[in-house]
């Protein structure tokens, strides 16, 4: 399986006061269903146990991070390995947070880092649905997600990013935030999306950037049925019908001006740009409820933690 290396932006001060954490999880298909078969951890990142609200074939896992946010000097690394035929649904109990960064660099680096990597073997299935990420005013965040899969894997996943707390008069103006999302299929890069926000580049306000919106999000869907495969010779018709269903759902939710859908190398890319994280999440859930039966042959069963 491909292993990728993320190059962090340069450190401007000698690292001090760091809190490094990593969590590596392995999920395997066993005679009793998908099981968490290996765990390696250091620091505050953890999981308790797998939940099975829809039966043994799909494990629901909640990532726990007791500090509830990332501060300057923190570096969190998360690695998820989904073995052949295993099925994982991965989520978090609450919002992730990049807090205001330290300004005094004599006590340590200002940057806050989270690096996540999913490795999917053949016929593996992974659904990655974290709660929203809140980036506070004055943050200095770097957040990356790499997905490595095969042409027979299935991946459904989203990320929802909220800039500042505008309802509390904490507008995101001076902060810095870089987000990098990549997807590799059979070691070939098919999707690369990067946004780097800083006071100097005006992407927050620019019409070709966020155009003043405070919430941006992406929903990715990849499955054999969506790309060229001899077993799916009627792919163009299926794909067209699926896109039409998604557009109809977006229209029914009156979200045409906030949501776009594109197809890149068999990967469906659905984007939201607006001001309301909850609106975005509910819309993405409705799209998941549409996509899951078609791509995974399973009805959508929401994680219990979403209702607490």
From Swiss-Prot:
It is found in: Cytoplasm. Keywords: Chaperone, Cytoplasm, Nickel insertion. InterPro entries: UreD. The keyword Cytoplasm applies. One of its GO terms (cellular component) is cytoplasm. GO terms for molecular function: nickel cation binding. UreD, UreF and UreG form a complex that acts as a GTP-hydrolysis-dependent molecular chaperone, activating the urease apoprotein by helping to assemble the nickel containing metallocenter of UreC. The UreE protein probably delivers the nickel. HAMAP family: UreD. Belongs to the UreD family. PANTHER family: UREASE ACCESSORY PROTEIN D. Required for maturation of urease via the functional incorporation of the urease nickel metallocenter. This is Urease accessory protein UreD. It comes from Psychromonas ingrahamii (strain DSM 17664 / CCUG 51855 / 37). The lineage of its organism: Bacteria, Pseudomonadati, Pseudomonadota, Gammaproteobacteria, Alteromonadales.
